[in-house]
């Protein structure tokens, strides 16, 4: 039997106002039918909502794109002298104003596609596509950093087996448990709240990522 995981508690999601659990409109889809995200449907038939078990994970996942460029960090590391300067990425000041933090329950089993049974299945089902892309092998380590095409095809494999979504650990830290929830979204929204600039989890996420709100 293929491995599954169920959320141990409520799920959190950062989304745009007025409803953080509203999926993106199909009009915003890319020409390939996806929205460019990790577990989107490669056939463009179902949409996916991304949520986290940890409130702070929502901030880390969403704000990671504002981190300082890795090339810049490498160049700074080569400069002689006191290591007392670290360039901070800048988050637009209105970032908080345009979003809400939603809370929902999702008491259903999700595909744990990084578990051994799923890896064995995906290695077989996605073999042709892996070879076409020049990928020599597929294992859990590779799937963690695999091209979008591969993770999206893995999503389709889970969907075709009637899984309501996927459990996965964050690329930014395996202490963050994330969930890709397939349409028709088996969730029960509980609440949604505005994000204060002094929010404790937001502040900690900014610290982890070495970014800051513009104007602070």
Task: Map each language-model feature to its residues.
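Active-site and NAD+-binding cores of ADP-ribose-processing enzymes
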Residues: 1-38, 71-216
């Amino acid at each position: 039997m293929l491995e599954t995981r169920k959320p141990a508690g409520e799920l959190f999601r950062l989304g745009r106002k007025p409803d953080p659990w509203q999926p993106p409109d199909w009009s915003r889809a890319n020409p390939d039918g996806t929205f460019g995200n990790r577990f989107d449907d490669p056939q463009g038939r179902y949409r996916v909502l991304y949520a986290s078990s940890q409130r702070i994970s929502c901030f880390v996942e969403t704000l990671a794109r504002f981190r300082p460029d890795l090339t810049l960090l490498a160049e700074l590391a080569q400069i002689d002298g006191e290591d007392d300067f670290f360039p901070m990425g800048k988050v637009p000041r209105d970032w908080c104003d345009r979003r809400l933090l939603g809370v929902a329950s999702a008491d259903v089993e999700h595909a744990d596609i990084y578990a051994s049974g799923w890896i064995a299945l995906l290695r077989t089902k996605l073999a042709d596509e892996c070879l076409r892309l020049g990928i020599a092998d597929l294992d859990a380590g590779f799937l963690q950093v695999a091209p979008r095409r591969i993770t999206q095809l893995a999503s389709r494999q889970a969907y075709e087996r009637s899984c309501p979504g996927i459990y996965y650990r964050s690329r930014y830290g395996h202490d963050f448990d994330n969930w890709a929830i397939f349409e028709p979204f088996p969730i029960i929204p509980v609440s949604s709240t505005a994000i204060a600039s002094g929010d404790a989890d937001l502040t900690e996420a900014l610290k982890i990522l070495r970014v800051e709100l513009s104007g602070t």
